[in-house]
């Protein structure tokens, strides 16, 4: 199951970003007193009562030059589409406004649970105002103060109560789940159609975790796969086409549920900043990654073009140096046959376990080749290493002092591990721990 998604909805200047930052535990959004100022990150992981969940600040979803109320409506619609639980936030100092009532009218239509949060109630006297908000029709209002962090525990308890009722879409561990992500119009749907048109592919559609998400299950060479949220790739409409951050939000949810992520680039347009941002989310989530250059048929080529394009990708995506780069055309289906083998290989490497004795031979050979660094007269000593997890493969190296493990030496060890075991298509993580 993907993590539950909680969306914070409300008119501008009710304190959505402050609460978002409080819950996320870090200052992610830009917080000012000017309406509509949220510009930065709108999506963050958070944790409460042993629940991991994703948090959205819909104020960060910029609809463009639409009228004020239209923007609020569209942000609320997106929250209703994407969230499992909605926090409807109002300003306790200003009472119920017509804009609050507009948001309430939209939220009446949703079957998703709505938790009403009355912000900016910084002391007990102010809480006398809370009863006015029962008129909005969402039951008990939760008094909170974003500035002082008051009342957030009760608010999150109320959200967590609803997490228990979220339906799970659980595939067996043998099923490889993957998604294709990328900017609008890079050809994600066309790639899916071209893949599913291959002779060896047997297709069926299954319901995803949200009411409008459809996953596509298929079998390839007797292995079962699921393409996560094929409905999201095909979603049209003004909000979805024009809102860059909406497409990122949808991609993040798909990444969360996937083992392997295909980052799709448009060969005609080259590499844009948004491509790097979207790819960065897959890397940060520790997923296996394959880079797919689509629309290769539309590019004028000579014998150097592909190599130069790949070099350009490597320069822009240095954090994805482990990801294979595939060139293909969904339109002509040329090289489409290379995609499934690459996904299978990345998935296998993402789950690969290596023997401890072989791993330690590799580590000790690496140390002999390149002695450990020193700092202030102390030298790093490596005692032994062991693999502690897969998806992604994660290793703990036991040392005398973790502070002496410089990132460049950690990178050197990673490269030696990759030389020995491959791991193409997957990130690997290395943690230094003091031997007890």
Swiss-Prot record:
Residues 4-167, 176-351 form the EngA-type G domain. Residues 352-436 form the KH-like domain. SUPFAM superfamilies: P-loop containing nucleoside triphosphate hydrolases. Transmembrane segments: none annotated. GO terms for biological process: ribosome biogenesis. GO terms for molecular function: GTP binding; ribosome binding. PANTHER family: GTPASE DER (PTHR43834:SF6). Belongs to the TRAFAC class TrmE-Era-EngA-EngB-Septin-like GTPase superfamily. EngA (Der) GTPase family. This is GTPase Der.
